[in-house]
């Protein structure tokens, strides 16, 4: 992946940054692509760093993700709740599956999407192989995770758990405006809010 560099001029001279490091200076984190352990570790580290820099200033988490590994997403979610700063979530492009879950987990009143964003929720995906007992163990675990996800989504959207369970039985796609009406986000952004 090509990563652009920017030059910043100051009284002490010029300094070169990769674009993500430059955005981090403005408390912006980019969550882009499939969510897996390596990406989650990077997001968690950035959240913790920004909290250490200033625990009173908001952090802006931009999301463009098709989803990914549940436990990786939970590590980001738990860190968002663990740190003191509010985490504002902004969907750019798409927030599907775990991406949509994390979008909904931003600070209340600070969950956004750009007008042409696509948001999708569904039940956890999984597969199991092995002996019947192993498959049964995996099935119980995925049902447990489904319950946790549905409970958190219900809390975040102020929908009933039964509605979340019904809507996530299959892929449930929404426009930015529909996601606002559903309660996944608080506002559709036409212009930058910073």
UniProtKB/Swiss-Prot annotation:
Keywords: Cytoplasm, Hydrolase, Protease, Serine protease. One of its GO terms (biological process) is protein quality control for misfolded or incompletely synthesized proteins. It comes from the Bacteria. It catalyses: Hydrolysis of proteins to small peptides in the presence of ATP and magnesium. alpha-casein is the usual test substrate. In the absence of ATP, only oligopeptides shorter than five residues are hydrolyzed (such as succinyl-Leu-Tyr-|-NHMec, and Leu-Tyr-Leu-|-Tyr-Trp, in which cleavage of the -Tyr-|-Leu- and -Tyr-|-Trp bonds also occurs). GO terms for molecular function: ATP-dependent peptidase activity; ATPase binding; serine-type endopeptidase activity. It is an enzyme of class 3 (hydrolase). Its EC number is 3.4.21.92. The keyword Glycoprotein does not apply. It is found in: Cytoplasm. The keyword Nucleotide-binding does not apply. InterPro entries: ClpP, ClpP/crotonase-like_dom_sf, ClpP/TepA, ClpP_His_AS, ClpP_Ser_AS. Fourteen ClpP subunits assemble into 2 heptameric rings which stack back to back to give a disk-like structure with a central cavity, resembling the structure of eukaryotic proteasomes. This is ATP-dependent Clp protease proteolytic subunit. It comes from Campylobacter jejuni subsp. jejuni serotype O:2 (strain ATCC 700819 / NCTC 11168).
